[in-house]
């Protein structure tokens, strides 16, 4: 597979300290490449060096076989989509205007831009007639991030850079957007470089994962190889961490009183006590409410509100341990 991005002996120094040290890395065209590791490991710095927002102190970075030093960086960035944790939609622009930003800079005709906006909104399940003229403040966090994603792919860039884009979202929105990224990648084949500190997210999304610590890549491999053959105990512990957390089920919600006694008339989708929370996330990203069934009897219902309340309580409990 062709190399799209390559780091050769790259170093980055801040205040006399190396935050990236002798980084050698090749990212292949068409893959989802995930940078993962603890806070301060150099993930975001590495990502920022790809589009020239941060310049290396030594070494060289190549994009499509050419050193970044040879590019007009502004024009090069038009060929790199970007999705951030902060969402960063322009607040005074409509959804349509936000999506059109790069195509307009590239000189696309008005009708071509309008057609592209409608095509992309439909692709992510947002009705163009309802959403194209809305302002960002009128959207939920998940809807804003969907717009952020399609804005990044609007001009069909060679690569999309994603810096912890879903970390501020609730579990249901996060799961839904992860599925969206996988679906769009399968359809479009665009190279994605994705930064996260979440092991489960890295394993779910990545074709390859680079595990970073103290500015160095400790191991770069497929998710399967990282899980089966971690290079050292530190990597093993890091990737074992998600397995050590309790896998919540519907029963945990019911026992703790986090459900509704009434059942909405339009609620048809059912779950039982043994249904894992991950499956509940997926269902609630599609249906507004789901029915809890135990021993062939409907005992209540769930919405995202009950899930958030339960998870918030558990998070507070863990912080107090």
Regions found by a protein language model. Give the residues of each.
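Conserved ABC ATPase "signature" region
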Residues: 111-130
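Conserved ABC ATPase "signature" C-loop
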Residues: 214-215
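Conserved ABC transporter NBD signature motif
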Residues: 59-67, 76
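A short, proline-enriched helix->beta-strand linker immediately N-terminal to the Walker B motif
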Residues: 154-158
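Helix-to-loop junction immediately C-terminal to a conserved catalytic motif
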Residues: 51
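Conserved ABC ATPase signature
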Residues: 135-139, 143
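ABC ATPase "signature
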Residues: 220-221, 229, 301
């Amino acid at each position: 597979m062709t190399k799209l991005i390559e780091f050769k002996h790259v170093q980055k120094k801040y205040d006399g300290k190396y935050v990236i040290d002798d980084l050698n890395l090749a990212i292949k065209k068409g893959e989802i490449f995930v940078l993962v590791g603890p806070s301060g490991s150099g993930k975001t710095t590495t990502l920022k060096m790809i589009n020239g927002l941060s310049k290396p102190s030594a070494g060289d970075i190549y994009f499509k076989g050419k050193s970044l030093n040879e590019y007009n960086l502004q024009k090069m960035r038009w060929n790199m989509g970007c999705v951030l944790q902060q969402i960063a939609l322009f607040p005074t622009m409509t959804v349509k205007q936000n999506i059109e930003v790069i195509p307009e800079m590239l000189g696309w005709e008005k009708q071509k831009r309008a057609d592209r906006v409608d095509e992309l909104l439909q692709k992510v399940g947002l009705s163009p007639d309802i959403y194209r003229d809305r302002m960002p403040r009128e959207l939920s966090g998940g809807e804003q991030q969907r717009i952020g994603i399609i804005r990044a792919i609007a001009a069909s860039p060679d690569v999309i850079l994603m810096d912890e884009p879903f970390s501020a979202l609730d579990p249901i929105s996060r799961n839904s957007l992860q599925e969206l990224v996988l679906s769009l990648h399968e359809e479009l084949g665009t190279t994605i470089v994705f930064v996260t500190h979440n092991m489960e997210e890295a394993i779910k999304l990545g074709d390859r994962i680079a595990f970073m610590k103290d500015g160095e890549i400790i191991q770069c491999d497929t998710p399967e190889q990282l899980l089966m053959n971690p290079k050292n105990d530190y990597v093993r512990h890091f990737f074992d961490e998600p397995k050590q957390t309790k896998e919540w089920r519907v029963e945990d919600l019911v026992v703790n009183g986090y459900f509704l006694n009434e059942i909405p008339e339009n609620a048809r989708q059912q779950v039982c006590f043994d249904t894992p929370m991950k499956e509940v996330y997926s269902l609630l990203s599609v249906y507004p409410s789901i029915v809890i069934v135990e021993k062939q009897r409907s005992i209540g219902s769930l919405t995202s509100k009950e899930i958030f309340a339960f998870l918030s309580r558990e998070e507070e409990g863990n912080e107090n341990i």
